[in-house]
Every structure is written in structure tokens, then in C-alpha cells.
Amino acid sequence: MLTESRRKQYVEVLATHYVDGEVRPRTIHIPLVGEFDIEEVKRVGLTKDHTTHEIAKQYTVVVKGKETHLFEDSGRWFVLMRT
């Protein structure tokens, strides 16, 4: 079985921070690629970062009608882009 090769790409995220501590990402800006509105946040959970093997918060989000993942680790946001 072939697996896609991916690389960690840090991104800028516009997010709303609520008084109860909840964070809702609204927009992802990928340098040299563009800006993408997040239509929906489906799930939030913890996962192991494949590159650093540290625990990161994983947001399952919908962008342009497709489900994808956005990660946050120690205040830095990233996506796993195809190489």
C-alpha cells in the first residue's frame, strides 16, 4: 500500500478565544498558497505529532467542503502538506 508523503508546514491562523478557554480557528493562511476559511470544526482532540513525536492538539475542520486536519502545538499552528 502506498502512503502519501507529507511535510509539516507552519501556518497563520485567525482564531476566536472564548472566556471558557475554548479556541475556535476561523481562517488558515498558508504563505505563498493563500487564505482558507474554516467552514466547520468537527472534532478537537490530542494526537502524537508525526515529526516531533510530541503531543499536539488536532482540529478536524472542513475547508472548501473537504475534511482536513489542523494542528496546534505550544501556540504554533501547522498542517501536513503533500510533498
Where do the protein language model's features map onto the residues?
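Cysteine-centric segments in proteins
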Residues: 1-83
